[in-house]
Amino acid sequence: METIKRHLDLRPILKAKSCFLLGPRQTGKTSLLEAQLPDATRIDLLDDEIFLRLQAKPTMLRDYIKHSGQVVVIDEIQRVPPLLNEVHRLIESDKSIRFVLTGSSARKLRKKGVNLLGGRARSRRLHPFVWAELQGSKIGFDLPRSLLYGSIPSIVYSDAPRDDLKSYVGDYLKEEIAMEAATRNLPAFSRFLETAAHCNGQILNFQKIGNDAQVKRSTAQNYFELLRDTLLGSDLPAYKKTRSRKATTTSKFYFFDLGVVQYLRGVRDLAKGTPLFGEAFEAYIHHELASWCDYHSDHELSYWRSQDGRHEVDFIINGDVAIECKSTHAVDAGDIKGLNAFALETTLRHRIIVCFEPRPRRVSGIEILPWAHFLEKLWSGDLIR
């Protein structure tokens, strides 16, 4: 099986500091580290013997340190948060040692009193595959498949993606949530997940979601926080720095992978031209943009909507690049209204419509780009530097 080269490269980071590498299960953290750091010492906290030993006596971590300049990978660091105190001590005693601390959940790491190394480690998040990684591989990039089955590496490689998505969601419910001891009511959480999937890319109405999932409003809020903590979803903040029109201030919520969303929704087919296809296309572009922003420092992703709801722009990068997604082969005047309205509120370097037109063109200062052309410009660095 081909090992697909990942865009995220930890080696430049490790020249300066240690690193947290966070990401949901099966996003490829282990494969990335094996490819980039083949000589690193690996400590797997999913190994019960190692887990019990280091949980009982975190100072035994020093037994794994053999020489200066060593790189030590600790997998699933959230299982033994007190181990971070020993990591801190070892970094202080030998400035040449580097740790890579992986985690599939940030929940226990965010608790009060957990040592996050006080700036001695940078943090990176690994996403499922992106266009630039698949396009350059033997597998290649298949947009319809990505919209339906997502980009989790094990699903991309799979000959039975829907069956494997079923297993993935089941494993998440049984293992990740149970391991975190985050909720004891798995049937209610399962109902909530299905309801939440229908809210992907939307502003959340906790009362309605709670009613649909047959849980309290406060429980729905807590469950969304659990999704964030276990890296299964994240917020897209609203852009608020407008000149005249008041803007919506509430975030939208996105799951980390579109295949998980489609499985939870029960979607088995996506027909072009349908609202469902349009939603999926927009969510996929969000995946690409969120991944790009996380892999490159100092970039902010948001969306803009006027408070009266009349105008909206799907994505804003750094406040000066506005991007609209349209699953159409022919962009018309109605498709550019949101970009034009937003241009009156701030100074923009780029206004872009990502669509299915056959070739790039420009209309009234707006770049109309075929989706593949847009992604090539994004990942090559031609769009944002």
Identify what each model region corresponds to.
Residues 43-71:
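Short glycine-rich substrate-engagement loop in P-loop NTPases that contacts/grips substrate
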Residues 161-321:
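Accessory nucleic acid-recognition modules appended to NTPase machines
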Residues 107-122, 139:
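Short regulatory helix/loop adjacent to the ATP-binding pocket of P-loop NTPases
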Residues 21:
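Hydrophobic anchor at the beta1->P-loop junction of P-loop NTPases
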Residues 1-13:
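Pre-Walker A adenine-sensing motif
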Residues 138, 358-385:
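Domain-level recognition of nuclease-like catalytic cores that cleave nucleotide substrates
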Residues 84-107, 115:
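Conserved catalytic/switch belt of AAA+ P-loop NTPases
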